[in-house]
């Protein structure tokens, strides 16, 4: 990919950054493992720092709804909670469904309880609305029209 192409492809049509995972590779993961047991790290599913105007508002680990259960006492999640608590930021593990889009929240620290209930399941619209509230912003009518407002069948039974 040329430098010029990268510059023109940094943002999608709606102004959000494009996915950049093509810049990463498996070799660094393998190399880091070679550094030994006393140098632990974890490759997370999709760790996001939700932010507004350059200031973080939440630390969220997104996981597909069929991913393995998360143990918040595991060193990985204790480290993430400590990181979030130091700011302090809400820390959440959020499972997602894709058809329709929906989200189930697992609370990772006390700060998250201000925004969500543990185990709360939300439609895409309700979840995104909450993310906007964290930023003290409002969902636009245009975005509102695009978001799923129902839950998948397996969540409504």
Predicted regions and their residues:
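Long, compositionally biased, intrinsically disordered segments
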Residues: 48, 52, 77, 95-96
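Nucleic-acid nuclease catalytic cores
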Residues: 84-110
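Active-site-adjacent loop/helix micro-motif of nuclease/hydrolase catalytic cores
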Residues: 39, 66-77
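Acidic-basic catalytic patches of nuclease active cores, encompassing PD-(D/E)XK
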Residues: 1-42, 53, 146, 150-154
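Short connector loops at helix/strand junctions that flank enzyme active sites
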Residues: 41-43, 55-59, 75, 86-88
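Helix-rich interaction surfaces within compact, conserved domain-sized segments
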Residues: 110-156
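Conserved catalytic cores of phosphodiester-cleaving nucleases, focusing on short active-site segments
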Residues: 44-50, 54-66
């Amino acid at each position: 990919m040329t430098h010029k192409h990268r510059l023109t492809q940094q943002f999608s049509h709606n102004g959000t950054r494009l996915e950049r995972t093509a810049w990463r590779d498996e070799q660094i993961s393998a190399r880091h493992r070679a550094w030994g047991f006393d140098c632990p790290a974890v490759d997370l599913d999709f760790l996001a720092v939700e932010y507004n105007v350059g200031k973080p508002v939440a630390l969220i680990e997104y996981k597909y709804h069929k991913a393995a259960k998360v143990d918040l006492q595991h060193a990985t999640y204790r480290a993430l909670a400590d990181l979030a608590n130091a700011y302090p930021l809400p820390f959440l593990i959020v499972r997602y469904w894709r058809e329709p889009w929906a989200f189930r929240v697992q609370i990772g620290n006390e700060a998250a309880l201000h925004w969500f209930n543990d185990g709360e399941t939300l439609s895409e619209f309700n979840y995104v609305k909450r993310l906007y509230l964290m930023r003290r912003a409002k969902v636009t009518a245009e975005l509102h029209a695009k978001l799923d407002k129902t839950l998948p069948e397996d969540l409504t039974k």
